[in-house]
A protein has these predicted regions:
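Conserved ABC ATPase signature
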Residues: 83, 145-148
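Short coil-to-helix segment of the ABC ATPase nucleotide-binding domain corresponding to the Q-loop/switch region
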Residues: 103-113
């Protein structure tokens, strides 16, 4: 990505679900926002005000219906799925409101999952996951499912 003064820039961004229908929902309605390097930003608002939608757009999980989103000076609409995946993996961190573990996987498999996306080989991946689980006191629960 080219160097840019602003890390994030939204210009007149809309996210419209069911556009043109009677039940159309404008989750984002002309949002403009600039976040510079080193800035901290809190997104607050009432339930249903578009916070999660905006975070999904900012995190490259969703694209705006219209408007411009520049991430580090690059228009995210011009990026391929592979490039967006790389950005999500290497440049954007997510902390979800819910723990979002995959219920069908063991604790160990859930910890290994991001390492798979990073291309870490199976032996190293398991060693790294076991070490991380030991550090947080969960080494004895590696075969458990998240709900156990």
């Amino acid at each position: 990505m080219p160097m840019a003064k602003n890390l994030v820039e939204l210009r007149d961004v809309y996210k419209i679900y069911g556009e043109g229908r009677e039940s159309e929902v404008r989750a984002l309605d002309g949002v403009s926002l600039t976040i510079g390097k080193g800035e901290f930003v809190a997104v607050v608002g009432q339930s249903g005000s578009g916070k999660s939608t905006m975070m999904n757009v900012l995190g490259c999980l969703d694209i705006p219906t219209r408007g411009t989103y520049l991430l580090g000076g690059t228009d995210v609409r011009e990026l391929t799925d592979k490039e967006l995946s790389h950005i999500r993996n290497k440049q954007i961190g997510f902390i979800f409101q819910q723990y979002n573990l995959i219920q069908s996987l063991t604790v160990l498999e859930n910890v290994e999952l991001p390492l798979i996306y990073q291309g870490v080989n199976a032996d190293d991946r398991q060693d790294m996951a076991l070490e991380a689980l030991a550090r947080v006191g969960l080494a004895n629960r590696i075969k458990h499912r998240p709900v156990e």
